Amino acid sequence: MTGSGPWGAFEPRFYFTKYPDGLEGDPARGWGFRTEIGTAVVPTFESFKKFMPKENWWPRDEMWNKHYFGQNAFNAAPDRYDASITKGFGKPEGIEDYCRKAQLVNIESNKAMYEGWLDRMWEDASGIMTWMGQSAYPSMVWQTYDYYYDLTGAFWGAKSACEPVHILWNPVTDGVKIANTTARDMEGLTAEVKVYNMDGKSVEAYTQSAIVNSPSNSTVQCFTIGFNKERKNLSLNKPTFASSTTYG
C-alpha cells in the first residue's frame, strides 16, 4: 500500500519516474498498490454547457470554482492542467476549443497513469484504484464519465491502457513493452514502432519490429527506440555570429 494521490494531471513521463509520495504514503514504497489516484478531468462541451451559466463560460472565473476547478479542488491542480493544454495542444481560443483540447489531456494523462504501473508490473507495482469513476455533482475533476453519464477522455485513456494485451512506450527509457494481464501465454506477437516527424513523414531510422513471446500476467521488453539522447544542444557545431555594436 502506497497511500493516496496525487490527484492532478501530470505529463506522461511523471507516471514512469520513480514514484512521488502520495498522501499518508511512504516515498520509499514506490509504486506498490496505490489506493487512490486521479486527475482533473474537464468534461465535454456538451456537458459543460448544461451546468455552467453562459455568462461564465469563458474565461475561467469564480463560478468554475463551484464546480471544483479552482481553490475548492486545489489538489486537482487546475493551473497545471490548463498549462498542459496550452503546452501540448495550443492555447485554447474559447470554451469549445478548451473542452475539446481538454479531452486530449484527459486521454494522455489517464492512459499514462495506468501504463506507468503496467510498465513495472510485479516489480514493485501491483495496481491502482482511480479516484474516481463518476462525479455525483457536475464537476471538472475526478471522473471517467461525468454527471450526465457522458464519457470523458479519461475513460478512453484508461480503457486503452487496460486492454488485456497492451503495447506501451515508456517515455523515460524509450522502452517498448507488452503488458499481458490475461491468464494465457501469448507467443509470436509482433511489436512494431514507427516514428513520424512534424510533417507526418515516417523517420525510417527509428522504425523497428520484433517477434515477442508474452507470458501471462507479466510485462516484457520488446526493444528500445534509439532516439539520440547525446546531443541536447541543437545549436552544437552550428555557425553563429555576434556583435557588440549598436547596429549589429
Task: Tell where the protein language model's regions lie, with residue ranges.
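Polar, glycine-rich mid-to-C-terminal structural blocks
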Residues: M1-F33, V193, N197-D199
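Intrinsically disordered, low-complexity segments enriched in small/polar residues
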Residues: G3-P6, E36, Y68, M186, ...
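Disordered, acidic Ser/Thr/Pro-rich linker "stalks" and the adjacent N-terminal cap
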Residues: K232-G248
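Intrinsically disordered, low-complexity Pro/Gly/Ser/Thr-rich segments with frequent PxxP/GP/PP motifs
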Residues: L189-R231
